Amino acid sequence: MERVICIAEIGLNWFGDIKLAKEMISLSKDCGADIVKFQLYRPKEILGINSPYLKDAERGVPTEAQARELKEYADLIEIEWCASVFHPGLVDLTEELGVKRYKIASRSVKDLVLLKRINETKKPVIMSVGMSDDTEISRAMGALRDVDDISLLYCVCLYPTNVGAINLDKLDKIRTRYQTRVGFSSHCPKIAPTLAAVARGATVIEHHVCMHRISRLGCDIPSSLNFKEFKKLIGYIRDMEQLNG
């Protein structure tokens, strides 16, 4: 069984507190995660000034200086740092930081200008396709034509996602149609769907992580696992990798 890339999506759950962000990076490594991920975008432009999520985003999206500090810390403790980039201009920053790969969020699959800029880097891409139809995914793949390593992640864009809303048959459909590695980006506060996805051949998994699952702390908390749960999830995945047949 191919080794599964496990991504700890810290996202907005560090609330603009650098000390907390570093603690979460360290805990992600202790859990066995391969990658810690943040989000880079301009909140007012993406969400609009009347969005109920704007306050969370403005404190949870790193500034350039914060992104540098967090990347340096991740390098120091030897865990890969990655970001979902929502603007073509921010690719210059991530290239300066020396990221190894790019994560493309579901909402960015239609942004061909962004995808073409990422294509220029020729670095591996992990792309969530939960909001896209076949035409949109095909166009995105065309924009990424120079990228040799692409993984497409099935996800359900409900926050949080109930188990009954998840259809893992789509993993097989994505794999067959696009001949790529497939994965699962979960917004479900349970580990069973992710384990089922790995059993169905997912080679990349992504999950939001948080210190405490208290909804009032932030908009991503209800979709997150705490670190005890995340460690258990990765432990089960590593056990599954050792199974034969």
Where are the regions that the model predicts?
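Catalytic cores and adjacent flexible loops of soluble metabolic enzymes
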Residues: 1-245
